[in-house]
Amino acid sequence: IKHCRQRFGVVLIDTPPSQSDLIAAAVDASSLVVLVTTPGPLDLDRMWETAKAIDRPSSVLLTQTRANTVALRDAERFLSDHGLARFDATIPFKEALRRSSESGRMPSASGYGLVANEPIEAFHGIE
């Protein structure tokens, strides 16, 4: 990771949600942790437990969102009430995005492009 950081300046590490050893190693190597969650109450509670356990700056990325819904407003309120930073953009729910793991193709309008610069800007703000 040090070599990559020297070469590229910023290194993003994506981990699967259920491999705690891998997640712990990635968090230990991180300057900024992106906590990814859906707006669902169970997912938010799980993410909150993770947020409390890490000792790094973090920001929450809401995925599978639907604009102008009670669920999204409740999730945003949850993050605010718990003092959690979040990305300005969210990743909208799209059926094609759900199926992308089967096809191996990411839809062009997935929404991830909207948040691409936010972690880099945040990273530079804490370094």
Q: What name fits each language-model region?
A:
Residues 108-127:
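Histidine-centered active-site loop/cap adjacent to the catalytic His
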Residues 41, 63-68:
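Short histidine/acidic/glycine/proline-rich micro-motifs that form metal-
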Residues 66, 76-108, 121:
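Beta-strand-loop-alpha "switch" segments that mediate conformational coupling across diverse proteins
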Residues 18-41:
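Inter-motif core of Ras-like GTPase G domains
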Residues 13, 35, 60-62:
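Structural beta-sheet core signal
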Residues 32-35, 42-58, 70-80:
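Anionic-ligand binding region
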